[in-house]
């Protein structure tokens, strides 16, 4: 009989609850790092969550590079951002699978991508403004949703998992918050 956490007919919540019940406290803690350790007794391989995709798959060899987010925002084109999210996810998945075949679970090989940056760029002194869609909350929301939907896909299984950057605290630099 298949373990409940492996049963694709169950909801993600049901599967996660079953898996969490099987893990020791130490095993649960080992999964909180970006470089999650394997849990051989449950068939869980090592996994590295650290990957970036703000404007294409970053630092993982050859990949399509798109303009910085602030430049993409200037298009006001949600369909374009959706397509860029799709392409980024497709390339990330291909790189993930190729690395996995070679037992490579290092940084920049996972399917959780730190993107998009949904912080609002309200202070020009902030050094990461180019990673955002600008200062307008409406535009940032529309473009962010389009990018995430493109990246994650419409299927039962996510193509890649978008992890929105910032939102509240990415403007924390050098020990203090920059106004913004």
Please place each PLM-identified region on the residue numbering.
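Glycoside hydrolase catalytic-domain context in secreted enzymes
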Residues: 1-180
